[in-house]
Amino acid sequence: MDAHLDELGQLADTAGAGVVGRTYQRIEAPTPNLYLGQGKVEELKGLLLKAGSTLVLFDEPLSPVQGTNLERALAVRVMDRTEVILDIFATRARSAEAKMQVELAQLEYLLPRLTRMWTHLSRIRGGIGLRGPGETQLETDRRAIRRKISVLKKRLEDVADHRANQRRGRRDLPSAALIGYTNAGKSSMLKALSGDDLFVEDRLFATLDTLTREVDVGGGYRVRLTDTVGFIRKLPHHLVASFRATLEEARAAELLLHVIDASHPAWEHQVEVVENVLEEMGLYEPGGGKRDAGSGKRDARSGKRDAGCERPERKRVIYVFNKADLLPDPDAFLEHVREHYPHAVLTSTHPASRIPHPGMGVEGLRSVLRASAQALRPVARIQVPVADGKLIAALHRDSEVMSEVQVDGVVEVTARVEARLLGKLRQQGITVEISV
């Protein structure tokens, strides 16, 4: 419970609200009218009066009725966790795409709460006895919001199509995505691996837009690495749905780097939160069995799949335990972690940190990425008839061509080729030799 309230306090701080007190109540089930019991509401009124507070944040989602009744009973502004997160996203959105995604989520959250929001407007206008809008005005606003939601969904579908076309046009390099709980250090990891001067901030949801960089992983290999928006406990469904075009980068990636804040006391729960969201996206099947010893992937042999969700392609997942410089005993931590994640990488992006383990740290992660790139894009010599210009052009488009030599009516192309493409070439009768 304390950890949950700590995180809610962090969200409040990120949103610009100062926390002056906290309380909780254990209940078997929330009451339909106030969520809390009447006695707790009276206690909360006393705490608010004593502290002079004008805002109450709830860690749990409130129904429109509960929110309205609580505000009447407490005579202060009431926000649930979802509304706080939406507010943070609204202030952090920078790109046109992120702003559309946030606006869509906000409107879908607002629609069933429109009457309550009008009550706030009446208060702001300040007149005693000032009546709220009539039913005609409310219905007009509802129709306008529904139209706007429809427009935003169409625009975001266009964005998703555009992203998909972009990905199809850049399959020459292996693709990887940084995923993880918010503030785990994903952006810092991209900055450290790429060497670029990227914006990094030690705050929740510092990054909302995807950012992609080509990373040199050594041995002549490069990986196209994408930073994605962070996840959080009880991430609003509206946001998951609205940010689907952005999160699709993780779905489309051939490799996932799950960045974990090793110093956080609840890191295991944070891992579970991230994997649950990935299940919603179809990257994992529900069932939560063992992690695969070779890659940290879930055993997806049990559990139902979400309706309408395509069977996900199993991906290699590298578990990256970051912020190792904040651990009191990195050796003991690594020993514990490797019982469940045998190939885990322990890192720190802090410039002054030293990871006292061979193969660890950012450079250790780079070598792990190199091995993955070699598996995803093996070097192959492919013999293509000179007349098959279409296939030669496709190899240049979808592979990293290293050399091309024409001998006796055959073009021998040496390239780093997507592993699954090699099988298709062999099925077409094309001679393929893998370089070891």
Give names to the regions the model predicted.
Residues I27-A29, P61-P64, E83-L86, V229-I232, ...:
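Conserved nucleotide-binding/hydrolysis micro-motifs of P-loop NTPases
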Residues I27-Y35, L57-P64, R233-P236, R251-V273, ...:
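Conserved Switch II/interswitch segment of TRAFAC-class P-loop GTPases
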Residues P30-L34, R92-E97, T136-Q137, D197-F199, ...:
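Flexible beta-alpha connector loops of hexameric P-loop NTPases
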Residues A73-G126, L130-P133, Y284-E285, R311-P385, ...:
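Canonical P-loop GTPase G-domain recognition
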Residues M117-L255:
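Conserved G1/Walker A P-loop phosphate-binding module
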Residues G288, A293-S295, A300-S302, A307-C309, ...:
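Intrinsically disordered, low-complexity proline-rich regions
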Residues A371-L421:
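Long, well-ordered amphipathic alpha-helical subdomains in the mid-to-C-terminal portions
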